[in-house]
C-alpha cells in the first residue's frame, strides 16, 4: 500500500531537528534518544547497509557510534560524550582541523552578507579564489572551474580534456589499476574497482587501465593506442593512490609519465582530491617531483572541513575551449560565496601556519612509530607506508584490519579502511594534530596490536 504524503509529519520532524541544532548541549537522555533515532532513520530512510559497515569499528559489535559535534581542533565527540582523536579526517577533508576558527569565521561573515550568488551578476569571491589558485598551483595552471565534490572535479577534467582533444582526433583515456576517481559515470569509468563498476556496466567507452607505478606499461599502452588509431586524449592519475591503499609509485614515476604525455601529445590530469592542500608535506603532491599537470583536480580539504567545494584548474591553452561558450559545463552551486569563502580561508590557514611542512614533520614521526610496530608485530602487520599525513597500515588479511579499527575505537582513536583495499587501514589525521596527540596515537596502536595478539593466541 502506498504511503500518503504527510505535511504534519514532515513539519514535526524538521522542527525536532531544528530544535536539536539550536541546542548547545544535550543531556544524557536526549543523547540516548538521538542515538536510537539516528539508527532507525538510517535503517528506514538512508541505507541500512551503512549500519553494518559501521559495525566494524564499534566496541562489542554494536551499530556505529553517532557523532554529535567536533571536540577540539583534532577530535570528535559522540552522543555518549566520548571524545576521539580523529585519524580518519573525514577521508581527508579536515586538513586544517575541525571547525577551524578562521574558516568558520569567514563562512559566518559571508553568510551574514550573501549566502548564494544571483547566477547573473559577477560574484567576487569566485574571482578571488580563482586568482589565488592560479598563484598557488604549479606551472601554467591558470583558470578554475568550481563545483561541489571531487567526483565533479574529475568529471569536469574529463570533459575539458575531451573538448580540447576531440578536434585533434584523440578520444582515449588511460587510468591505472587500483585508481579511485569517484563514482559518477565518467569518473567511475576511470575508477578501477570492479565492485563499484559492475552494477553500472557498460560504462563510458574509451577508458583503459594499466598497472600503477609501471612506466613501461604506460608507454606500451600509449604506443598500442597510437598504432590502432585510438590516440590518447589524457592520462589521469593520483600522485598517491588513496583509496587504493595509500600506494606510492616509484620515485620519478610522475616525471616519466609527464614526459610520455608530452611525447604522445596526451594531456596529464592529476587527481589531487585527496593528496592536495598540504596533505603529503607539499601543498600538492606533484610538487615532490616538480611535475606540472595540464589539469589539476581538487576537493575534500579545499573547503576546510566546513563547506563542500571542488575545483578543476587548467592551463589557458586547455581551458580556452570553454571561452566561446562558458555554459558548456556549469553547476548551480559551484563557486558559491560560502564555499569560496571557506576555500580562501583554508588556503590562508595552510600558508600562514605552514601546515604542509608540519604534515611532513608529524607524518614522519607517526610513520616511524607505525613501522616500528610493524617490526614488532610481523604476524599481524605487513607494512606501514605513506607520505606526510597520508599513511596506511596494511594487515595480513581483512579481518585483522577490521579488528585493528575496532581496537583503535576502544582506544578512542578513529580510523577506517580504504575503499579499494579492505585490509589496509588509513591514517589521515588533520595536519593540525599536535605532537602529544601523535604520541597518543602511536601508544593506542601499540595497545591495539597487543590486544589483538592476545586474542589470536587465545583463539
From Swiss-Prot:
GO terms for biological process: L-lysine catabolic process; putrescine catabolic process. Pathway: Amine and polyamine degradation; putrescine degradation; 4-aminobutanal from putrescine (transaminase route): step 1/1. The modification N6-(pyridoxal phosphate)lysine is found at residue 300. It catalyses: an alkane-alpha,omega-diamine + 2-oxoglutarate = an omega-aminoaldehyde + L-glutamate; putrescine + 2-oxoglutarate = 1-pyrroline + L-glutamate + H2O; cadaverine + 2-oxoglutarate = 5-aminopentanal + L-glutamate. Pyridoxal 5'-phosphate binds at residues 150-151, 274, 332. Coiled coil: none annotated. It comes from the Bacteria. The keyword Cell division does not apply. The keyword Repressor does not apply. Keywords: Aminotransferase, Pyridoxal phosphate, Transferase. GO terms for molecular function: diamine transaminase activity; identical protein binding; putrescine--2-oxoglutarate transaminase activity; pyridoxal phosphate binding. Its cofactor is pyridoxal 5'-phosphate. Disulfide bonds: none annotated. Its EC number is 2.6.1.82, 2.6.1.29. It is an enzyme of class 2 (transferase). NCBIfam families: PRK11522.1 (NF008570), putres_am_tran (TIGR03372). Belongs to the class-III pyridoxal-phosphate-dependent aminotransferase family. Putrescine aminotransferase subfamily. Catalyzes the aminotransferase reaction from putrescine to 2-oxoglutarate, leading to glutamate and 4-aminobutanal, which spontaneously cyclizes to form 1-pyrroline. This is the first step in one of two pathways for putrescine degradation, where putrescine is converted into 4-aminobutanoate (gamma-aminobutyrate or GABA) via 4-aminobutanal. Also functions as a cadaverine transaminase in a a L-lysine degradation pathway to succinate that proceeds via cadaverine, glutarate and L-2-hydroxyglutarate. This is Putrescine aminotransferase. The gene is patA.
